[in-house]
């Protein structure tokens, strides 16, 4: 094949097009390069939050999700969104793994156990998924459904657990199925740091009914609050009947559904429940045999469980498309964003594709980045320019971390300085690309420095934003792409298909994004 034109993709991390108000560090900054590019070349904006990047509605984007979508050329639905969509379209209620658990729970003497973090934090789980499981059990006529409720207080307010529990109890009453069998703070039930003594307390309560007791789940939480113990740290508590007997424990042959969708804090308890042989982390009070265990997501490939929602594997990211046709590529960023231009951009793949070179530029060792707002952008630029002018690569990927990382500090003047530094660096990249008659594509993954004050107040805002990001196509003067029209309504998943069109490469079926180019020049 003929060598395609070189394309350099620059990701301005945390640079969105925000409101014109005193908290917008990007508007406050002197950015002659970006101003000229936006005024001179084809430009549009891209949505980078919510369903457009595979997140729940209205949830702000982040660097991991942004780079996944940029590299995949399709919307990569995060697990929480995949589960939400399955509930919406009804496929959740036909899920094969869940049906297997229901079949087991229908057998005489069996119990269906639903285990996980309650609340609306959305980081490890979401209560609406538990409520959907309860509805599923009710539809199936399962007589015994035991809920083992883990309280949050970390991704939710410290004492919001009681309200989430009340919502759960109301659902149990409405559906006329199920009961709460144990209450445990996530500090114990969801440890991830090999503090197995914490996991043991949760295990003992869930499997053997050992530990402190309460007559109701509300009593367990209210008593903890009275002792100054917030949701995260509620000691595993067994709910007992009038005779002091546990309402339910996990027994031989039962069915268990662990409804957390994030793996890291679900692994230890799952291992304790399923490891038949060499488990030595703590002495188990009892090990229930012949469990049928379902996990909402894949926690570990080797766990002997059924997985309700298998990983969404990005099999053909942009980096692979380029590699498969023998093109070389170069990815660079400083430490803070290196994983994003490698692992995440490549669809969750650690190893480089054949022909892919990478360069990590160390981030400065400072307590906070407002103390050095330029971070390592000049050094990243040096590396990128060298790669571009070498003409060894058909594709160069560059990330500038400054608008995001300095924006997170909340120091407005430093964020302005960070934006101005990145603008100068972008000018150097543009010159290098021009020198080899290449194409420069400028975009971002999400916003940050565009809103640093809560509107109408002087309160500092340090989180990401839900503003669209720029997409600018800088083409050589002789190129048919020099004056194309770019469509509106695009999203990050449309960037890779656009790059493939510029390079004259076919778009694989797996990439469901659409090129942003809608009106190529006459004579192309």
Curated annotation (Swiss-Prot):
The keyword RNA-binding does not apply. Mn(2+) 1 binds at residues 404, 408, 464. The keyword Metal-binding applies. Keywords: Glycolysis, Isomerase, Manganese, Metal-binding. Signal peptide: none annotated. GO terms for biological process: glucose catabolic process; glycolytic process. Pfam families: iPGM_N, Metalloenzyme. It catalyses: (2R)-2-phosphoglycerate = (2R)-3-phosphoglycerate. Belongs to the BPG-independent phosphoglycerate mutase family. This is 2,3-bisphosphoglycerate-independent phosphoglycerate mutase. It comes from Thermomicrobium roseum (strain ATCC 27502 / DSM 5159 / P-2).
């Amino acid at each position: 094949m003929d060598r395609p034109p070189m394309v350099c993709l620059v990701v301005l991390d945390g640079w969105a097009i925000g409101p014109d108000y005193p908290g917008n560090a990007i508007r406050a900054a002197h950015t002659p390069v970006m101003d000229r590019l936006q005024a001179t070349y084809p430009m549009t904006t891209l949505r980078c939050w919510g369903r457009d990047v595979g997140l729940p509605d209205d949830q702000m984007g982040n660097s991991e999700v942004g780079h996944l979508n940029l590299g995949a050329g399709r919307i990569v639905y995060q697990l929480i969104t995949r589960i939400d969509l399955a509930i919406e379209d009804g496929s959740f209620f036909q899920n094969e793994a869940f049906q297997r658990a229901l079949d087991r729970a229908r057998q005489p003497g069996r119990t269906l156990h639903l285990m996980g973090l309650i609340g609306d934090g959305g980081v490890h789980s979401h209560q609406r998924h538990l409520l959907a499981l309860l509805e599923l059990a009710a539809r199936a006529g399962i007589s015994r459904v035991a809920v083992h409720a883990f309280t949050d207080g970390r991704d939710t307010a410290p004492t919001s657990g009681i309200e989430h529990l009340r919502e759960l109890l109301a659902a149990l009453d409405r559906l006329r199925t199920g009961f709460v069998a144990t209450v445990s703070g996530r500090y114990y039930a969801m440890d991830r740091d090999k503090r197995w003594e914490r996991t043991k307390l949760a295990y003992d309560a869930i499997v053997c009914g050992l530990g402190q007791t309460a007559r109701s789940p509300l009593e367990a939480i209210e008593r903890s609050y009275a002792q100054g113990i917030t949701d995260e740290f509620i000691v595993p508590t067994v709910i007992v009947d009038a005779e002091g007997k546990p309402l339910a424990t996990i027994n031989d042959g039962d069915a268990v559904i662990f409804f957390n969708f994030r793996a890291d804090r679900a692994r230890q308890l799952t291992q304790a429940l399923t490891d038949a042989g060499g488990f030595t982390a703590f002495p188990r009070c009892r090990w229930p045999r012949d469990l049928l265990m379902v996990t909402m997501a894949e926690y570990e490939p080797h766990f002997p469980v059924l997985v309700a929602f298998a990983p969404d594997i990005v099999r053909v990211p942009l980096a692979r498309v380029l590699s498969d046709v023998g093109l070389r590529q170069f990815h660079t960023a400083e430490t803070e964003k290196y994983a994003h231009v490698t692992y995440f951009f490549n669809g969750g793949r650690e190893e480089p594709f054949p022909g892919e070179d990478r360069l990590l530029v160390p981030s400065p060792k400072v307590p906070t980045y407002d103390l050095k707002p330029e971070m390592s952008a000049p050094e990243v630029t040096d590396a990128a320019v060298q790669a571009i002018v070498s003409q060894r690569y058909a594709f160069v990927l560059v990330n500038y971390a400054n608008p995001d990382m300095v924006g997170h500090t909340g120091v407005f003047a430093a964020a302005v300085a960070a934006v101005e530094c990145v603008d100068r660096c972008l000018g150097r990249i543009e010159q290098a690309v021009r020198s080899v008659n290449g194409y420069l594509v400028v975009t971002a993954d999400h916003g940050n420095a565009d809103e640093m004050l809560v509107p109408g107040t002087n309160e500092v805002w340090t989180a990401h934003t839900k503003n669209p990001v720029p997409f600018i196509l800088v083409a050589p003067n002789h190129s048919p792409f020099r004056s194309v029209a770019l469509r509106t309504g695009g999203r990050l998943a449309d960037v890779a298909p656009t790059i493939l069109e510029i390079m004259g490469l076919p778009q694989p079926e797996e990439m469901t994004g659409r090129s942003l180019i809608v009106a190529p020049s006459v004579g192309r």
